[in-house]
Amino acid sequence: KTCENLADTY
């Protein structure tokens, strides 16, 4: 959901 979350997923 958050940019940080996306970075963690990618």
UniProtKB/Swiss-Prot annotation:
This is Defensin-like protein. Keywords: Antibiotic, Antimicrobial, Antiviral protein, Fungicide, Mitogen, Plant defense. One of its GO terms (biological process) is defense response to Gram-negative bacterium. The lineage of its organism: Eukaryota, Viridiplantae, Streptophyta, Embryophyta, Tracheophyta. It comes from the Eukaryota. Has antifungal activity against F.oxysporum, B.cinera and M.arachidicola with IC(50) values of 1.4 uM, 2.5 uM and 0.15 uM, respectively. Has antibacterial activity against the Gram-positive bacteria B.megaterium, B.subtilis and M.phlei, and the Gram-negative bacterium P.vulgaris. No antibacterial activity against the Gram-positive bacteria B.cereus and S.aureus, or the Gram-negative bacteria E.coli, E.aerogenes, P.aeruginosa and P.fluorescens. Has mitogenic activity towards murine splenocytes. Inhibits the proliferation of M1 leukemia and MCF-7 breast cancer cells in vitro. The keyword Amino-acid biosynthesis does not apply. The keyword Signal does not apply. Belongs to the DEFL family.
